[in-house]
């Protein structure tokens, strides 16, 4: 059904920060099944399609999970939202499980952590979901966050990288400290 922010009021700040130009990334770590993917990932996709069209890359933990997310959550959302479905390109060649084109020319890529997904394309928005399940080094090229963030640099202050995760890994940098609320 429709998003109801009163059920997850703790998601409002991170969601709003996604459009704040003074930040180039949002990293949200929280328990499983608390609205992170629906609010941050799916909500950001829909917001972008309807309110602020731009190319976007969504990276799931594996190719199988990318396909599943596209075929279940995104396909259902697109089908049941008149505002989204009327913007989707009607051409069969424009839409498949990993690529979605829209009438305004914007593009949504649903991928997985591989150097080919993280190379040679620019996206204003990049979202990494279930980051704790990503490999620590993607195809010998570095961590997924650094690779993903490079995709948004062309867009300067309007580029944004989102990482959503559960606390599934030990902290490796014990000197890191949060510098502020965001």
Where in the sequence are the language-model features?
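Phosphate/NTP-binding elements of NTP-utilizing enzymes
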Residues: 1-182
